[in-house]
């Protein structure tokens, strides 16, 4: 089986970053579906994380802590503020985690994703950007042919005019695939439902500490 995700030491210390990566992708899906646009640099980082097969740390997957700052803030908003948090983002986050769990049992699909991601990396080198339309179309195809075959589907809600756009649909599928990549990394780091139940304060503390480093 081709494992397209690196495994790092000190798993428990880095799971918060990986979870932030999941929520960052989910928040970008929300932005695009509702507004037809999103934070471009953050989008580039999330897609880039999917294409980075070798990294020295979880932070390095996102190009450093700054690359997942939006995700860390989104994570804190969900855990700390029940009034302002956007449940649509949480729904996408949970959906991605469910898909990743089902994917983990399918070595054939993991192999297919790994091969497809390597092809997307080659396309990135050819076209010069991880967010080139052809690269995004390839990533969307990977999602549809693998994760899209499960009975469980993530239903994205938003403005129909934006959702009907082929380019936007490709971006959304690519982001969901990036979210699944982060969810797999999160699980490798010991992430799971019990974390939310018994270690929320620890997650908040870690996220705040990471954000403090960025000041």
Regions found by a protein language model. Name each.
Residues 54-68, 132-154:
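An acidic intrinsically disordered interaction segment
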Residues 1-77:
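Leu/Val/Ala/Ile-rich N-terminal alpha-helices, chiefly Sec-type signal peptides and the beginnings
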Residues 171-215:
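Alpha-helical oligomerization segments
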Residues 51-130:
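Long amphipathic alpha-helical segments with strong coiled-coil/leucine-zipper propensity
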Residues 17, 21-28, 88-91, 95-98, ...:
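Charged, amphipathic alpha-helical oligomerization/scaffolding segments
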Residues 7-21, 57-60, 81-84, 88-91, ...:
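Non-transmembrane, amphipathic alpha-helical segments
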Residues 122-123, 152-164:
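Short, charged/polar, low-complexity loop and linker segments
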